[in-house]
Amino acid sequence: MVYGLSMNLDSLTQKKRRLDESRPLPPEVLKNLEQWFLIELTYTSNALEGNTLTRLETAVVVEKGLTVGGKSLAEHLEATNHAAALRKVLEIARSPVASLREHILLDLHAMILRGIDDANAGRYRSIPVRISGSRVVLPNPAKVSAWMAEFFRDLLAMAGSHPVEIAAEAHYRLVTIHPFIDGNGRTARLLMNLILLQNGYPPALIRTRDRIPYLKSLEKAQLGGSKEDYLKIISRSVERSFAIYFQALGGEQPNAVASSDLLRIGDLAKKTGETLATLRHWMKQGLLEPADTTEAGYQLFEPEAADRVQRIRELQSDRLTLAEIRQELSSKEI
């Protein structure tokens, strides 16, 4: 397993050494980082799968136990479940890599689907599944158990490789086997981050704006193409988290998204030529989602939201209803 320059391993190793020089991290810094990543990873991982809770709403649900009007019970459970699973990951991360066993993976998956699909939580699938909109053919359910046994044998055999290589490969293989009916992507990202944390690396933070490149890079590799694009995304996600750690050690508040990169709804309207009323209507219909909300209540959008607005208009010109457009734009579980 040699990924070479695609993962920029030397740079990641140097950043790890720099971080090690600051260890043990001051308790208040460590606590702040863990709480920040708890919300950020929960928000981003769920958003990658179509959850419409914003970053601020995710924090309200996870930290305060409150509900958000207009959001489904499943979306609330996805937030609280992922946060609970991530807390479990932080607890397990203190154990050696060799202790990763099947029961840990199944327990994490059970936590992800708790209250959402209890019948399948923590269990391998027994039926065929497909990735919506993808040409990838997933393993026959009768072969899942054998594939997973091989997966864990290979995971142990990778012990001498670079931790970021191991984490990326574990994530890739798990979503490719697709052992569960639902929750494969979230569980794979938890496993990837568990491996990183066990080895002293920060978790990989895959941004919501990287969703399409992330999904396309996985599909490309699964169809027999190069893993280069996928590995670059994972590498940059780890580098991004290193920057957040160093930011916190420098006395700054962790921040994955620079507000200057985001658009207020008025800016988005000007950029796209749409009215505020239209954009707000699309938000209510679940077609358009803010990336964040300021303390003053201003909704902020990723620059890529302009492309989504254009796509909505294109689908409307094809005479699709709003419900059909929402379905077309809906997230594809990986």
Predicted regions located by residue number:
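FIC/Doc superfamily catalytic core
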Residues: 1-182, 186-290, 294-299, 317, ...
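Terminal helix-turn-helix DNA-binding modules in bacterial transcription factors
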Residues: 303-322
